């Protein structure tokens, strides 16, 4: 049987810190920099956002290796192995990926979205009228 609980945000955060008999929690994360490290580090033992409590010496070793390697392909390979291990051991189940849509009137120019999905407003302006 599955029981879904709807909670106020403050209560959810408290439950997340001490899940008790809870088997599954919804959790989202937005990268603060453009690198797989922004997501993979979340599952390291001792990371403040490791709400799953996941611990793996192999995972830690793969992430440690990726941080020491200067060659981009080797670094990516170590990160892929870490990600595969994480998915195989299932402390996390990817359910959805957030997508944002942006609408702008035709007379606005300079509309740009950063690789992190944020609206870059620096160059927004009205097009010159002819």
PLM features: what roles do these ranges have?
Residues 1-7, 74:
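A local structural motif
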Residues 10, 15-130:
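Detector for C-terminal structural segments
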């Amino acid at each position: 049987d599955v029981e879904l609980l709807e909670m106020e945000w403050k209560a959810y955060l408290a439950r997340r810190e001490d899940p008790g008999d809870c088997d599954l929690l919804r959790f989202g994360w937005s990268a603060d920099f453009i690198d797989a490290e922004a997501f993979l580090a979340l599952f390291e033992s001792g990371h403040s956002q490791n709400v799953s409590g996941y611990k793996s010496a192999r995972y830690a070793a793969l992430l440690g290796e990726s941080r020491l390697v200067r060659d981009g392909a080797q670094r990516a390979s170590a990160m892929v192995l870490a990600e595969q291990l994480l998915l195989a051991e299932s402390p996390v189940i990817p359910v959805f990926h957030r997508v944002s849509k942006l609408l702008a009137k035709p007379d606005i120019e300079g509309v740009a979205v950063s690789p992190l999905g944020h609206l870059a407003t620096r160059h927004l302006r009205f097009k010159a009228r002819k």
